[in-house]
């Protein structure tokens, strides 16, 4: 079974995130949507609220397959999460070229930490690319 981890804060989840999740289901058998807590960020929603919003968005509203999508929280390195769940793919969404520099560096660091885990970049559809969680909160 090919397992992918889609890490993020998802504060809140956006249509762009959902688009990336749907596209990733074409590449892997199971996607683990992993919402994290970063002490350097100010959050609008608690971790439990974010998980509930993600579940409602994916399972109830969109009726996506619960067997193919697992929603968890985590507070460790993404690489450690991949090893725990035997995931070989880290899924990252890109909205614009401005996202690429940071994501490229992150993918390089993850590759150094574990050569067997690949990072896959997915673009959301154009109508969802300009929406960030920051703007949804505002």
PLM feature spans:
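Nucleotidyltransferase catalytic core that binds NTPs
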Residues: 1-138
């Amino acid at each position: 079974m090919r397992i992918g981890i889609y890490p993020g804060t998802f504060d809140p989840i956006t249509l762009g995130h959902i688009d990336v999740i749907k596209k990733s289901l074409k590449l892997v058998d199971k996607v683990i949507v992993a919402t994290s807590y970063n002490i350097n960020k100010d959050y609008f929603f608690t971790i439990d609220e974010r998980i509930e919003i993600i579940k409602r968005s994916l399972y109830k509203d969109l009726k996506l397959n619960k067997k193919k999508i697992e929603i968890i929280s985590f507070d460790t390195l993404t690489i450690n999460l991949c090893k725990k769940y035997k995931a070989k793919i880290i899924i990252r969404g890109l909205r614009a070229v401005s996202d690429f520099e940071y994501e490229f560096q992150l993918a390089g660091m993850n590759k150094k930490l574990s050569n067997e885990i690949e990072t896959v970049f997915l673009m959301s559809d154009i109508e969802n690319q300009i929406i960030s969680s920051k703007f949804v909160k505002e």
